[in-house]
Amino acid sequence: MTVRTRVAPSPTGDPHVGTAYIALFNLCFARKHGGQFILRIEDTDQSRSTPESEQAILDSLRWLGLEWDEGPDVGGAAGPYRQSERKEIYAQYVQQLLDAGHAFKCYRTTEELDMLRAARKEAGIHSALKQSDLMLTEQEQAEREAAGIPYVVRMKVPEEEGACQVTDLLRGNIDLDWSMVDAQILMKSDGMPTYHLANVVDDHLMKITHVIRGEEWINSAPKHILLYQYFGWDVPVFCHLPLLRNPDKTKLSKRKNPTSILYYKQAGYLPEALTNYLGRMGWSMPDESEKFSIQEMLNHFDIARVSLGGPVFDIEKLNWLNGLWIREDLDDAALAQRLVDWKFNQDNLLAVIPHVKQRMETLGDFLPMVSFLAANTLGITEESFKGNKLDLEDQKKVLQFALWQLDTMRTWERDDIFATLKGLADGMGIKLKDFLAPLFVAISGSTASFSVMDAMVLLGSDLSRARLRVAVEVLGGAGKKVLKRYEKEFAALSQLNEESDAE
């Protein structure tokens, strides 16, 4: 048997460090066993998937030194490797399940589903919705079918009491109650599969032997095992890695820490150091050494050494490790070249010069005006904001609301950023000049910078958002009570904007 592993990210946003973490362990496991590592793009969510996001995933994983044997860009015998290009394949298997009575067409509307869930909640029923809850009479189904009402295809799941036993490479046997497993949607009304169907079909057809993924998928394993049984296929070996955590032990999220690989690239981290750090997430070298290369990790890799305690992604620890790599592995010439490749190259200079050229009298004027673009910390304090018109509490609210609003943006272009911020300023009833003042300080360290929108484009979305988070903390942060109040006000503001747009 040839060991085959895979990583299957969704191209719906910036490439996540969690994707790199899962990819690294899949790569190491495959290489250790003389096998193959596959990259698959799970783009069934066509409303959110973008080619730009896919390319960013490919570029980021390669920047980290993670290479795959098969994938959308390198091809392979099991392709295509984008799920959006496999729609006809999934349709065949959905029909197979329908013909065998393992799935059913569900014509229930969103309103009906909401009513069903509300009634169950009121009755104190906590089990998942099953086919007996969802299926219509033959007459009702025929009427809806004749009316052309859209339907989804759902899988049938056990309704009797009992448990599904999931065998995990790290955890052993796990018993999961069937009562909590719902009649999962397998095919959406647009004909695209959900993750659960596409995942199982692709893993089988691509001959994946070991499914190494995050522990958030443990509760979905019964559905996947059931699908393998329905199709009469062998179940691959499951291995669920522990989730990355914030220092406060909560799940790693961009609301508390930068999670995009692009952030770390733009902030000046070495790819070797970031990969090294991800390799230490729940795993350790036999000699407990903290600094090691991918090749050294491969040489000593044993997945049994993975610890199930939630590994903490601590940026301070990453900073320390990155410093070791700079000092111990780069001579002066190599470091100079890394600096050029990172920021001080012609492409970057040409992007910046138009924003400062008209203000320059000597070449010496250039660096003071743009140094904030290359700085990891700006050294701002509460005092930095006191010259602005809004009081400090209102400035903090502006920064937090701006951060939340910018989080919703699909593109990061100047005009889009301006429209987003202006709309928020209007909604909050604040003059744009006063609204932007705290953002100038947060992004550039002063109010004397060139356009804050241009600065945010040059910094990129991740660095920009990270600086806004820092500024909120500088102004005292948002504790639980304040955050709850902010969230309520922001939700009301968003609702007003939606109603205004509808008119």
Curated annotation (Swiss-Prot):
GO cellular component: cytosol
Family: Belongs to the class-I aminoacyl-tRNA synthetase family. Glutamate--tRNA ligase type 1 subfamily.
Catalytic reaction annotation: tRNA(Glu) + L-glutamate + ATP = L-glutamyl-tRNA(Glu) + AMP + diphosphate
One example of a Gene Ontology biological process annotation: glutamyl-tRNA aminoacylation
Gene assigned in the entry: gltX
Pfam families assigned to the protein according to its UniProt record, in alphabetical order: Anticodon_2, tRNA-synt_1c
Disulfide bonds: none
SUPFAM superfamilies the UniProt entry points to: An anticodon-binding domain of class I aminoacyl-tRNA synthetases, Nucleotidylyl transferase
Role played: Catalyzes the attachment of glutamate to tRNA(Glu) in a two-step reaction: glutamate is first activated by ATP to form Glu-AMP and then transferred to the acceptor end of tRNA(Glu).
Record InterPro entries: aa-tRNA-synth_I_cd-bd, aa-tRNA-synth_I_codon-bd_sub2, aa-tRNA-synth_I_CS, aa_tRNA-synth_I_cd-bd_sf, Glu-tRNA-ligase_bac/mito, Glu/Gln-tRNA-synth, Glu/Gln-tRNA-synth_Ib_cat-dom, GluQ/Sye
MF terms (GO), sorted A to Z: ATP binding; glutamate-tRNA ligase activity; tRNA binding; zinc ion binding
E.C. designation(s): 6.1.1.17
Domain of life (superkingdom): Bacteria
NCBIfam families reported for this sequence: gltX_bact
Cellular compartments annotated: Cytoplasm
UniProt subunit comment: Monomer.
Motif residue range(s): 'KMSKS' region: 251-255
Positions that bind ATP: 254
UniProt-recorded name of the protein: Glutamate--tRNA ligase
Motif ('HIGH' region): 9-19
PANTHER family named in the record: GLUTAMATE--TRNA LIGASE, GLUTAMATE--TRNA LIGASE, MITOCHONDRIAL-RELATED
EC primary class: ligase
Keyword vocabulary terms for this entry: Aminoacyl-tRNA synthetase, ATP-binding, Cytoplasm, Ligase, Nucleotide-binding, Protein biosynthesis
